[in-house]
A protein has these predicted regions:
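PLP-dependent aminotransferase-like
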Residues: 120-179
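Short acidic capping loops at alpha-helix termini that bridge into adjacent secondary structure
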Residues: 101-105, 126-127, 212, 234-235
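C-terminal segment of classical bacterial N-terminal signal peptides
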Residues: 22-28
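Active-site pre-lysine segment of PLP-dependent enzymes
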Residues: 163-172, 185, 189-208, 212-245
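N-terminal secretory signal peptides and thylakoid transit peptides that target proteins
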Residues: 1-18
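N-terminal small-domain helix-loop-helix segment of the aminotransferase-like
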Residues: 29-112, 117
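PLP-dependent aminotransferase class I/II
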Residues: 64, 235-301
Length: 301
């Protein structure tokens, strides 16, 4: 039996309801949905059994139990609707934790889109400067639009980011400095006082982006974040994601923290939170303050 139902049936459903009855329609749709699902091809949602997938640093334990419950509820109750209210809830949670406002935060489907928006925006002002080894995928985005290639500075012999050499390379041709801390793929962590001093000096010359995707996985995460520099008015932006320790890489939720001016400027180059979905937002909201799950994941990661 065809599952071809017009929107008119649901809007003006008095005729259908009288003929079939509300429960009958529900049973009919349920039966057809089960039949349709059974005919779909098998989908692989993660690595095959026995395979340890390491290349993207996802949390192998996946979403927390609270997140899984929230995903199911949001999918059932909100799957038919756009996710604006849930996005506002997550914005408020992030803002409260860091003592900022909604206007300092831009949500995106994972941190990759917002990092790409920042790179494209910054490329209008000059080249992007980064170390030889860092997660450069998003900073390469402007190259597809004809922007110059990333200007790279050699890492030290110990694979650390050479902050002194990076600072010396900043001139009027640089539109943004991109640093990952902890760095990917080296795993090296910059001393917080050294990175803080660098960001303060460098941000007087150009925009500084610090990607903190792995911040929650290091000891004393608050000590290492550069978000206080944003609050202090420095030309610094910080990216975060729910894809790593929170186990939500497949749910696609991330965000950027910046000044109101930088947030508005970067958002011109993308759709921001409009790209998010109910299930992902529900999972992020349920996970954000789940300290027990984060402690477990950090110990086992």
């Amino acid at each position: 039996m065809s599952y071809n139902r017009s929107r008119r049936l649901f809007i003006g459903g008095s005729v259908a309801a009288s003929a079939i009855g509300a429960s009958g329609l529900s049973n009919l749709v349920s039966a057809q949905s089960v039949e349709a699902a059974a005919s779909q091809p098998a989908v692989i949602y993660g690595p095959k059994p026995g395979v340890a997938k390491l290349n993207a640093n996802e949390n192998p334990f996946g979403p927390s139990p609270a997140a899984l419950e929230a995903i199911a509820t949001a999918s059932a109750q909100g799957g038919a609707y756009y996710a604006y209210p849930a996005a506002m809830t997550l914005l408020d949670m992030i803002a409260e934790r860091h003592g900022i406002t909604r206007k300092h935060i831009s949500l995106s489907a994972g941190s990759s889109p917002i990092l790409s928006y920042a790179a494209v925006a910054a490329s209008k002002n000059g080249k992007i400067l980064g170390p030889d080894l860092f997660w450069d995928t998003t900073s390469k985005a402007p190259e597809k639009q004809g922007a110059p290639e990333i200007m790279r500075i050699a890492n030290t012999a110990e694979l650390d980011i050479d902050l002194d050499a990076m600072y010396a390379a900043i001139d009027d041709s640089i539109g943004m400095v991109h640093i990952c801390n902890p760095n990917n793929p080296t795993g090296k962590v910059l001393a917080p006082n050294k990175l803080r001093d660098f960001c303060i000096k460098a941000s007087k010359k150009t925009l500084v982006l610090v990607d903190e995707a792995y911040n929650e996985l290091i000891d004393e995460p608050p000590k290492h974040t550069m978000i206080p520099l944003v609050k202090a008015g420095h030309n610094v932006i910080v990216a975060r994601t729910f894809s790593k320790i929170y186990g939500l890489a497949g749910m696609r939720v991330g965000y950027l923290i910046a000044s109101e001016e930088n947030t508005e400027w970067i958002n011109r180059y993308g759709m921001g939170g409009y790209t998010l979905n109910q299930a992902g937002l529900a999972a992020a909201i349920a996970s954000y303050n789940d300290d027990a799950f984060l402690t477990f994941s950090k110990a086992m990661f």
